[in-house]
Swiss-Prot record:
One of its GO terms (cellular component) is nucleus. Coiled coil: none annotated. This is Cyclin-D1-binding protein 1 homolog. Belongs to the CCNDBP1 family. It is found in: Cytoplasm; Nucleus. The keyword Nucleus applies.
Length: 344
């Protein structure tokens, strides 16, 4: 048998492992949880899951060390190593699938993404090892090993219940909306039309202003000012909802947990709508797109506030801000639409 054939045979367990880990990763991304029956202990789940994650990290370290310098491990050692890694991966996947949706879809999504990230890191590590087996430890292999460690360590930071998972989603939404609003305000402050002092917006003579596609006109700025009110209402709605969830959210019943999921799903639609509106406000301003995006954002905010009002996180003291922001959304929507009608 040639040296090349011998090496290929020795690496066969790793190729099989690579395929198996890829399949496990895809199953985690796409698969459903097992049916829950009886009592489920979230505390026990986390204890067992953390042990499973630790085992994957340890096996990845052993795998990387085994292939950190020549010569190649023996066929037997490769096979044993593959079995150990495979066992740790199957254990991790099995434990993940224990988590039922009744504990919260948002929580489960967070655990799913973290689990898939560990498996993706392992796939990348195996890719590197298989592409250059028997060579000295490369920077690429070090980086891939570190990525597996980082993905495993990330489990310490992920939410441990659905309330925390929903708060994490809301915090991300608040940050994204805040960034979009600040970018728009900064662009307005920095953008000046160098011809604005000598040519007005109505100058459409041939050979006149050729820079209107890059600067806001006075009417554009007026429109943006009205739209800014809706953007601020978006940020305020998400901040107030975050506070209500932080102080009032309960996890005693499946209905309460499901209501939190509904809030997270509704909130997740706000940021993309804010981005679409903000982008349509950059020059050249497309007023038809602005109207479409304003209406879409207002509808998303109204739905979010309606879901908030009917959920258990809306205490008696919260009704006033929900009603105020609902009115603010409607008021800003009408102001923008009125301005667009007057411009047409």
């Amino acid at each position: 048998m040639s040296a090349e054939n011998s090496r290929s045979e020795a690496l066969l367990p790793l190729r099989n492992l690579w395929n198996s880990v890829k399949c496990s990763r895809d199953r985690v991304r796409d698969g459903e949880s097992n049916d829950s029956s009886g009592t489920f202990s979230l505390a026990n789940f986390w204890e067992i899951l953390n042990e499973a994650v630790k085992a994957v990290s340890q096996e990845a370290t052993k795998l990387s060390l085994m292939f950190s310098k020549p010569p190649l491990p023996s066929d037997e050692d490769c096979a044993k190593m593959g079995e150990c890694v495979q066992k740790s991966v199957l254990t991790l996947c099995t434990v993940y699938f224990w988590l039922p949706k009744s504990q919260g879809v948002t929580l489960r999504r967070s655990v799913r993404d973290a689990t898939a990230e560990v498996l993706e890191g392992l796939v990348q590590l195996l890719d590197v090892i298989l592409s250059s087996p028997g060579q000295s430890l490369s920077q690429e292999q070090l980086t891939s090993t570190g990525s597996v460690w980082a993905a495993c360590d990330h489990f310490d930071q992920i939410p441990k219940d659905n309330r925390s998972a929903v708060l994490a989603v809301l915090s991300s939404c608040v940050g994204l909306v805040k960034d979009a609003l600040e970018e728009m305000q900064q662009a307005l402050a920095e953008s000046q039309d160098p011809f604005g002092d000598v040519l007005d917006d109505d100058d459409d003579d041939e050979g006149g202003r050729g820079n209107q596609d890059r600067y806001w006109s006075a009417s554009d700025r007026q429109l943006i000012g009205q739209c800014e009110g809706l953007l601020k209402a978006s940020a305020a709605s998400l901040r107030k909802l975050s506070s209500a969830v932080r102080h009032n959210a309960q996890l005693e019943t499946e209905q309460e947990i499901a209501q939190l999921d509904d809030l997270a799903d509704a909130a997740a639609h706000v940021s993309p709508c804010v981005d679409d509106l903000a982008l349509s406000l950059y020059p050249p301003v497309d007023r038809a797109a602005v109207e479409q995006n304003v209406c879409r954002l207002a509808a998303v905010l109204k739905k979010l506030l309606d879901i908030t009002r009917s959920s258990h996180v809306c205490a008696e003291a919260d009704v006033s801000w929900v009603e105020f922001l609902s009115g603010a959304v409607e008021h800003n929507l009408e102001k923008v639409r009125s301005l667009l009608r007057s411009d047409s």
